[in-house]
Amino acid sequence: MKKKMLTGFRPTGKLHLGHLHGNISNMIKNQKEYDNFFFLVDWHALSTEYQNPENIKTDLMDCVTDLVALGINPEYTHLYRQSDIPQIAELTLYFSMFTPLSWLERCPTYKEQVNELKTKDLSTLGFLSYPVLMAADILIVNSDIIPVGEDQLPHLEITREIARRFNHLYGKYFTEPREMLSRAARVPGTDGRKMSKSYNNAIFLSDGYDTIKSKVNMMITDPRRIHPKDPGHPEVCNIFSFYKIYKKEGIKEIEKRCKEGKIGCRDCKKEISKIIYDSLAEFREKRSEIKRDINFIYNILEEGKKQVGEIAKKTICDVREKIGID
């Protein structure tokens, strides 16, 4: 039997390079090897967008379109909407009964986002309990493997702790999922922070060449390099991070030329802009084709709802029996 692999996306806007190289690439590469679950986390989106939820549905459909255009194949992957599986909410409730507040309050991702998103009121139960809902997302299908970026590891550890505590209290049932780190676990945004829609620093997959070029030109490269022929320090350069993704085979030569002052930051930015744009040519073509038949996406989500719904119903029946409220 194939192991289950699961990942989710917040439908709060268009997909960007951080998504693609964070975990989508892993899902595409491993589609035939695992039983795949790929879902859109519209409840999670409400944790930060509860004051302005009107765009979530539109963004969700755009997100599914992007995923299919990138190569996520419904024949190998269950594509579904979080809110279409009500059993996730019920499982979250059960987990919340025994999850200590200290587990949530110590989560570094929680503290980081509260500090970074100061314009939003995140002093809510929904935002604090984000990792509990995430645990329910994962454990409702008893997933074995979770593709994640480094910043999501603390959340996954909370999922393991919740599974552990449930198994201890009510008997062995849940699998403790393990992470699959992507090769580019942290893609830098235009300001040097992790690429994120929330930080307004993302290069989107649907961006045109001029937009990509403009965003790449905004990036900080080497603050110690004053003149183009000065020796460079690629280890601190955000543009060099993209070379690691897109030109893995020639990375040593690029690093050498940079350190010797034989290639300037402007040259690198120009090359990376073109590489990024050209790498998305097939995606743009497929996305345009899918957009001509929107029912195609609705049908995919409906099928995913049916398939995952059956799994979720069984999990909840088993959990109720374990707890003793069946």
PLM regions and their residue ranges:
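N-terminal Rossmann-like or analogous alpha/beta NTP/dinucleotide-binding catalytic cores
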Residues: K2-A136, R284, S288
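Conserved aromatic-histidine-acidic binding/catalytic patches
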Residues: Q51, P147-E150, D230, E260
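A generic structural motif
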Residues: P11, I146-P147, N201
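Conserved nucleotide- and phosphate/pyrophosphate-binding catalytic cores
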Residues: H19, P154, R160-D326
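Classical nucleotidyltransferase
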Residues: E90-L93, S102, R106-L169, Y173-D191, ...
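N-terminal amphipathic alpha-helix/helix-capping segment at the start of soluble metabolic enzymes
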Residues: M1-K2, E310
